[in-house]
Amino acid sequence: MIYGIGTDIIKIARIEAALGRHGDRFAERVLGVEELEKYHRRKAKVAARGLRFLATRFAAKEAFSKAIGLGMHMPMTWRAAQILNAPSGQPIVVTSGKLAEFMQENGLTAQVSITDEVEYAVAFVIVEKK
């Protein structure tokens, strides 16, 4: 049964501006440990790839927060939800801490789809109740 649906679109230039103002502290605030490692690897190869990666993760977390009905309020925090990849490459939502407890206690699972184009990053999340 569908518990919630969330979507988000962000102009990549907004993320670029935030990085310009705050440097990598912005990425450190938004990304979990594994995401941050991947961000730095991509950024080291091509700066634009790092930027797009950060923008898609930002959009996915916003969409996820909407789908679970909490917005960015506890137990939902930027770093408690990571958007990682299954071995197939499919993006997956991995939660930790109080957010993982919330998901388990409520019998929730999430499916996420992300994409980016020159100017925008978009994410769509469906949360299901078992």
UniProtKB/Swiss-Prot annotation:
The keyword ATP-binding does not apply. Mg(2+) binds at D8, E62. One of its GO terms (cellular component) is cytoplasm. It is an enzyme of class 2 (transferase). Its cofactor is Mg(2+). Transfers the 4'-phosphopantetheine moiety from coenzyme A to a Ser of acyl-carrier-protein. This is Holo-[acyl-carrier-protein] synthase. It comes from Herminiimonas arsenicoxydans.
